[in-house]
């Protein structure tokens, strides 16, 4: 049995007893029922995920998958491909936005080279799982082989398992890859059936001509390859990216180990579509951090029946939104665990009648 198949079979359902107990405790804490809104429902979801009635999330980590895209050569991005490798080094040196926000909440940043088109120097904080020097240009040929697609997902699973084995109890997804909004839009269009123009945005800031070119390239690729929306590996093979597959694996690995996973922006959303097409049972384990500026993100939420925690007009990626989302998860669980009940505090409850 492959690692992918084994992982999918290990994904269960939410622990209803733990969730019910968490909700019962929320209802007697010193506040009107429901007064903390999503923080309350978030804590109950996390109780169901972990099977703990009062979960404590003390060891967060964000897994940042980095890879390049052959389709970037078609002029679909505002930045050159070498920025991918340059930003990976920035991550490793602690100078990127993701590093700042991760330090803010005490989260570890795990950087994975799953397909950067450069030979990166060895570094103690870099995990080298390179599947190739970027994907192929999917406007003229499949982005990768089916074997590579499965490998990408399994690399993500293994990275999640390793992080959890080291004590991580809350995971987030992050990405780096010039051209990856193009691949993500192609994945989203393929799986949801939405028109390409409806799910394709400006990425890192392309102009009108660049956006028109990006849409045309994706439409050309979908017409050429006809990816099967019911077969996630087929979609990943034909129009995906190595980091998208890797992040799908992180999601599946976290779900199989009953660890909450906070998904970042549009690229992580495309990965979530891959993951949940492979294993629909993974959906309840997902926590959507933010609504990205990328126009296709709402199609992801609609398809997966997810509601993001916040909308701050963000579009950076890297896991920045997901790390902010992890801080809300921690806050929600601390409310559930540390607040006093009406009985404990000697506070009168709601007058009935």
From Swiss-Prot:
Keywords: Cobalamin biosynthesis, Glycosyltransferase, Transferase. One of its GO terms (biological process) is cobalamin biosynthetic process. CDD domains: DMB-PRT_CobT. Pathway: Nucleoside biosynthesis; alpha-ribazole biosynthesis; alpha-ribazole from 5,6-dimethylbenzimidazole: step 1/2. The active site is at residue 318. It catalyses: 5,6-dimethylbenzimidazole + nicotinate beta-D-ribonucleotide = alpha-ribazole 5'-phosphate + nicotinate + H(+). Its EC number is 2.4.2.21. One of its GO terms (molecular function) is nicotinate-nucleotide-dimethylbenzimidazole phosphoribosyltransferase activity. The keyword Plastid does not apply. Pfam families: DBI_PRT (PF02277). Gene3D superfamilies: 1.10.1610.10, 3.40.50.10210. Catalyzes the synthesis of alpha-ribazole-5'-phosphate from nicotinate mononucleotide (NAMN) and 5,6-dimethylbenzimidazole (DMB). PANTHER family: NICOTINATE-NUCLEOTIDE--DIMETHYLBENZIMIDAZOLE PHOSPHORIBOSYLTRANSFERASE. Belongs to the CobT family. NCBIfam families: cobT_DBIPRT (TIGR03160), PRK00105.1 (NF000996). This is Nicotinate-nucleotide--dimethylbenzimidazole phosphoribosyltransferase.
